[in-house]
Every structure is written in structure tokens, then in C-alpha cells.
Amino acid sequence: FTVIEGARISAIRMKFECVADIGMNSVLAEYHRELLEQYDLLFVDMSYGGSHADIGNTEAHLKNYMQKNLRPEGGLWSGPGVRDFLTMTTDQVRIGQYSIASDEGGSVLKRQVTDRMSDYPLGAVLEKISLGTSEIDKYGLESRDVGAERSRYEAEIEEIGRPVEEVEEGVFEEVPLDNPADAANATRSIGVLNMVLEDASSVSAVKVDANQYISHRSRMQGTGMCREAASLTGEPNELVFQVYLFEKCGYYGEEMEKSLLKYQIEYILAGKNVDWQNLEYVARRLLRWREVANVIYILSDSAKVAEAHAAAGALAAVLACPALLEPVAYTILFAWAYVESLQDVKTLFSGGRVPIMKTAADWKTGINSLKNVRGSLTADSGGRGLNYKEYLQIMVFLLNQEKRTFRAMDIMEMDIRRTPGNAAFRMDACFDTYEAELSVSSRFGYAYEMTRLYGFY
């Protein structure tokens, strides 16, 4: 009897170990297929394609898997006359810890991305982004307000006032300024895309309800990052995640055919609910950067400064009132830098390159372009410096980490929901590691418990 009971106890323990392993791996085998196919991510969806996401669903799946393996139907050891030597039952399955993709600001998601791209050569990308961000910071492209500087010169012109001339005896009229800068500045209200694109109507106008997505709604919470997974695969790397985004998301000129929003990187940057608005945001930001850089350059170019003074000095109002010469010349220089910046944005949207800081050889527009801004802009796919994607990479690098991460998850939700059976898909319903507390018993009076941690790492 003692020998038989000892064998029974050993068999129960062994079977418990095997069944727990089979069950917990079976849960992981239910990973979300679309998430893997589209984004190379391994997560289990707690809703299992439904609208109710809860860890209780996974507990039920795990318990079912265990019970089926404890008491299998059919096979060699079942049927009439066959006695179960163990007769085991799953008493309890409790998942106390589980790492949801959005936990800790999305660190769970980014840990997996970092692990999957651990061999990616980052050196060249890092160097280009570092040099770009350093130049942007050095020259104040994000912080300098050239609009306010331009306004000061315009205010000075207004303070000086227009000269008057006698048009007939006793009748005096202001001499019109006819400042060429005014014609250029009048286009500022038109919108950058309308100025730089050959056919602005071709821009996507897809609109989404942003409140449906993870960055805008309340989120389910797991128990945070699995420290064991992080210790084995490494902590999340923001630069790796950024490189991953450019592999998995579309942007202007490189749109993803099956995506809901066509300008996904632009959405990550702007967070607007309409494609057009996201692209316009990026275009305006590019224009602002380029305008600061071009103002810095043009004010250092003595030939262009002299050209602007000559153009200002030829105006009748300036001839009649020499005090207007300096402020008018500077408004011309600022307007010229603005037109050059529009040309830069058009070049970038045409597949060309533009250096962050220019030399004389990089300058494209002439002073006469101020009178016919749109007509003077040309599509240019050449040049040196950075292209549109590389400017976007710098913008994404400068973006707040949380916005970058959760807007990226918005994109994932948008596109996964377009696939069959995933209409209610949520990133905050997906986990990649979990710890289960398991207990079984036998009708022979034995009971055992164990805790196991399983996951994708």
C-alpha cells in the first residue's frame, strides 16, 4: 500500500507540472494573429475577439486547458473498465500578475519591440538624429520667434508713418509703400499645403473618432513590467522604438495601403483626428524651422542684405522718407526667408533634401519671388542635407515619450480593428507575460499548489 501511495503522489506531482506547463503554453499559443502579422508583436488578447476584456477570460481558458489534460476524453487510458489512478481536478486558477502592453507608459510594449530589434544597426540613424537635434537646439529652430521679430519691423514702419505728397494744389495723399514683402506675407493665411503642393485636393481627408482610441480613453491596468522579462531581454530603448515606428507606420510619400489614416507618423506627431490636419501641422512646423534657419542665413549674407536695401531704397515712399529704409529692408529680408522656406518645404514634399543650415549655394529663390510666391516655387527632388523622413525622425525624437507611445498604439488599434473579428480590439487588453497561481486535488485526498510565470521573452 505504501509503495502504491508513494507512486501515486509522485505521479500527481509530475502530472500537475506537465499539465500546468501545457496549459500555460496553450494560453500563450492564443496570441493575437493580426498583431503579430502587422506589427511583429506577441500578445494575448484578453477579450478573445469579443467586446469584454478581462483577465477572468484568460483564467477560464487556462482552467479549461488544464482540466482537459488532467481528465482527457478518449485515448488509451479512458473507456469502460479503465480506472483513473490519479483522478485529478483543477480547483483554482488565479492570474495575479500580468503585463499589459500599455502598462508603465507603454514600457511593456517597448520592451518587446526592443527585444525583437536587438540586432538592428542603429549607429547611422542615431548619428543623424543626434546631429540634427543638436543643430536645431544650437540655432533655436524650435524656440526662436521670427514672427515676433518681423512684427517689430512692421510696427516701426507704422510708427514712422507714410510720407505725403501734394497731388494737386492743397490736396495731399499718402505715398503708397508698395512693399514687396506685403505680397509675400499675404500668403501666410492660405495654409502651407495649399502653397507647396501641386494638387492639395489629393491630400487624404480621412477622419477618425479619436475618443475611441487608447490615448484618449481610460485604460485598463495590468501589474506592470515583468522584471524577469526585462532582466533577460533588456530595458525598453526609445531610439529602437522610434526606428520600429518608421518600419511599421506610413507617412507622406510612403503611405501604407491598408492603413486607416494615411499619414500615421504625422498623426503620432500632431494627434489630430483628420489626415489633412496632421500633415498641415507637420508642414507648418517644417516651415517654422526652415524660416528660422533661413532668417539666420540671410541676415549673414551681405549680398542679399544689400539687395534688400536696394529694393527698399527704390520705393517711392522710402525715397520720400529715408527713415523707412532700414525697417522696410528688413521686412523684405524676412519675407524672402519665408518664401525660401516655402520652397524648402516643397522640396521636402517632392522627395528632395534640404540642409538644416544653408550656404549661398543652397539658396533657391530670388528677391523677385516675393511678388509671385506660388508661381516661383518649384518641385525639386535633389539637393543635399536631410530628406522629409529624416526631418520627421527628428520631430518624433523630440516628441514627449508618452504621446509618442500612446499615439503609436492608437495607430495599431485603428488598423487591427479593420480586420475581421477585431472590431473592438484594444491594446490595453493585451498581455505578454502572466503569473498564475494553480491548485489541483485528487479524489484520493491529495492537494497541491504552484505558482508559475510564463510569457513571451
Go through each PLM region and give its residues:
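Alpha-helical assembly-interface signal, strongest on the long, hydrophobic N-terminal helix that forms
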Residues: 1-53
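Long, compositionally biased low-complexity segments
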Residues: 33, 41-457
